Amino acid sequence: MNQPIELTAGGRPRRFALHLPRAGSGGGIPLVIVLHGNHPDASGQMMRDWTTFDEQAGAFGFAVAYPDGIGGCWADGRGVTTADEAGVDDVAFLRALIDTVAGRHGTHLDRTVVAGMSNGAFMAHRIALEASEKVAVFAAVAGGLPASLCDTRPSHAVSAMLIHGTADPVSPIDGGYSRHLGPNGELRGRTLSLAETAGFWRTVDRCPPGPGDTSATEFSSRITAPGGVGGTRVAAWTVLGGGHTWPGARPFPGAAQTGPQEFDTAEEICLFAEPLLASADSRRLSRA
């Protein structure tokens, strides 16, 4: 079941496409929000064509929303996108999206999964921090935590899956300033490294100290820190030789590369998220 939906948020008309796993109501199921990267032609449809979230919706019983950023980008808090410069309130939009889908289809208000790539990954960090009572799990692909968000303190723990390629030329895995592709790469706001980003979220979620659980293949390695508040986890996944890509993406017209095919990122996000969809009450962070 597929529906185009329009709403008003932050004084602006906004839109998103909604995929439900079966005909009729999506009552009592989680919602996954998929955020595209920054490009004048970027849209939710691009991520729908590029990923397998529609198929995963059927397998996992999730509803999936594909929102459109204004001008093909998100106001992710770095202050450098056209949406940031125009004062777009994308946090308000995504909050309204969650509320709208819950009101119409009965999806959980406090167990949302947000997945994004690049500018969408930065936005995923932001919404996880600023709407942590609604977002239970987020996945950031090719996008570390924006340095501008480091002082944000969420009210609830949020599980994090962080996926980054070692050869990313746009948003370096070691952090620093993100750049557009091309010989005159434009500085696009400073971000933390994958290790620093994982450390930040481990601290937020109050995961116990320690090296975490490690798994590795010929093409990637993954370190998962369990034991956060409400059972939250933080997984840092390094893709060896991976560029600024969504691993396992489908090829589509205009795509320069689709990245490693060792795993399907959409499937892995759903596998990670499924056991971590804890209520807001169980994820609430006590204040010292």
Report each predicted region and the residues it spans:
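Flexible "cap/lid" loop of the alpha/beta hydrolase fold
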Residues: 144-160, 175-178
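Acidic catalytic loop of the alpha/beta-hydrolase fold
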Residues: 168-171, 244-246
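A domain-start/cap signature at the N-terminus of enzymes
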Residues: 1-31, 55-56, 109-149, 195-199, ...
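Short beta-strand/loop motif that positions the catalytic acidic residue
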Residues: 162-164, 168
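Serine-hydrolase catalytic machinery in alpha/beta-hydrolase-like enzymes
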Residues: 3-113, 117, 122-130, 246-258
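Short alpha-helix in the alpha/beta-hydrolase fold that links the catalytic acid
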Residues: 47, 173-182, 186-203, 212-225, ...
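Mobile gating loops/cap/lid regions near enzyme active sites that modulate substrate access
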Residues: 230-256, 260-263
